[in-house]
C-alpha cells in the first residue's frame, strides 16, 4: 500500500469543496474500528481503492516559504468564500500542527471550516486562538456511534460554542424501526437532529455493512453527483449535489452574517 506524501496541498474535491488537509489518513479512526467511523468509513474505502494506506496518519506541511506563499496565493484566488480542513483525515489527530497551518492562512480571510471527530481534545489556549481567528468547527457524530464516542462529540460540540461557530454534522440513516436496534438508533438520531445548527449528512455504506445485511438500516440507490451510489437516507430530500448549489456551505451559511475576526494573535 502507498503512503500519503507529507506535502500540504490545496485541492478541489469531487463535490467542488476546496480542501487543505493538515493530516491525511486516520490512525485514530481505524484503530478504534478496522472499518473506520460508523463501521464504514467512505474516505477509507476510497483511499483503499486508490492504493493508499488510510490507517497511517501523515501530517502535511509547507515544504518551504515559497510553497506556503504559493498556497496563500491560490487560496486568495479561489472564488469560494471558505476552505475546508478535514476531507481525507481528521485534523484533531494533531491540533498543534493544524493550528500552525491555520495561523499561516488566516491572512487570506477565507472562512475556515474544520471537520472533526475530536480524537484529541482542544486545549483552552487552542480554543482561544480559534476564537480570535474565527473558524467553524463541524463535529461529526451519528446514532451509529457508541455512547462513549457520541457523548464525547456532543460535549465538545457544546464546549466550543463560546469560542467559535459550532455545527453538529449528523451522519444520518434510514433506520428500520421495526427492529429493536433500529428503533433505538432512530430515537438517538432524532435527539441529535434536535440540536441547533445541524447538518444532515447522508450515510454512504457498503453492501457488506453488517447493519445493511441485517436490515437495521434501509438503503437505496441514489444519484450522487454524476453517478449512482448506495445511500441510507432519512431525509429523502437531503442534498447530494455539488458544493456550489448547497445552501449550508459546511455550516458557514449558518453564521454568514457575522464578520470574520481580524486577528493579531499568533499560535506558538
Set out the residue ranges of the language-model regions.
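C-terminal accessory extensions appended to soluble enzyme cores
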Residues: 1-9, 194-268
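Canonical Radical SAM [4Fe-4S] cluster-binding loop centered on the CxxxCxxC motif
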Residues: 2-62, 243-256
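A sequence-composition feature that detects small, non-aromatic residues
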Residues: 32, 43-47, 66-69, 104, ...
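Short microdomains enriched in Cys/His and/or Lys/Arg
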Residues: 52-71, 266-268
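Conserved AdoMet/S-adenosylmethionine-binding subsite of the radical SAM
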Residues: 66-227, 231
Amino acid at each position: 500500500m502507498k503512503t500519503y506524501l507529507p506535502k500540504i496541498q490545496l485541492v478541489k474535491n469531487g463535490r467542488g469543496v476546496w480542501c487543505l488537509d493538515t493530516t491525511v489518513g486516520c490512525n485514530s479512526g481505524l484503530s478504534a474500528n478496522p472499518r473506520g467511523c460508523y463501521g464504514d468509513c467512505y474516505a477509507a474505502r476510497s483511499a483503499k481503492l486508490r492504493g493508499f494506506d488510510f490507517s497511517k496518519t501523515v501530517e502535511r506541511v509547507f515544504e518551504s516559504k515559497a510553497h506556503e506563499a504559493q498556497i496563500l496565493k491560490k487560496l486568495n484566488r479561489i472564488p469560494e468564500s471558505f476552505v475546508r480542513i478535514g476531507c481525507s483525515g481528521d485534523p484533531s489527530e494533531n491540533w498543534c500542527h493544524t493550528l500552525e497551518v491555520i495561523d499561516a492562512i488566516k491572512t487570506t480571510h477565507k472562512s475556515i471550516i474544520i471537520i472533526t471527530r475530536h480524537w484529541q481534545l482542544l486545549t483552552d489556549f487552542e480554543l482561544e486562538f480559534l476564537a480570535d481567528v474565527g473558524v467553524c468547527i463541524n463535529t461529526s457524530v451519528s446514532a451509529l456511534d457508541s455512547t462513549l464516542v457520541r457523548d464525547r462529540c456532543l460535549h465538545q460540540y457544546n464546549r466550543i460554542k463560546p469560542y467559535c461557530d459550532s455545527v453538529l454534522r449528523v451522519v444520518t440513516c434510514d433506520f428500520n424501526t421495526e427492529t429493536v436496534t433500529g428503533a433505538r438508533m432512530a430515537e438517538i438520531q432524532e435527539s441529535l437532529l434536535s440540536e441547533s445548527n445541524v447538518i444532515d449528512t447522508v450515510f454512504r455504506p457498503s453492501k457488506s455493512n453488517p447493519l445493511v445485511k441485517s436490515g437495521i438500516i434501509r438503503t437505496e440507490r441514489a444519484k450522487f453527483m454524476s453517478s449512482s451510489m448506495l445511500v441510507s437516507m432519512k431525509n429523502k430530500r437531503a442534498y447530494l449535489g455539488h458544493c456550489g448549489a448547497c445552501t449550508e456551505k459546511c455550516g458557514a451559511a449558518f453564521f454568514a452574517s457575522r464578520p470574520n475576526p481580524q486577528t493579531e494573535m499568533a499560535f506558538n
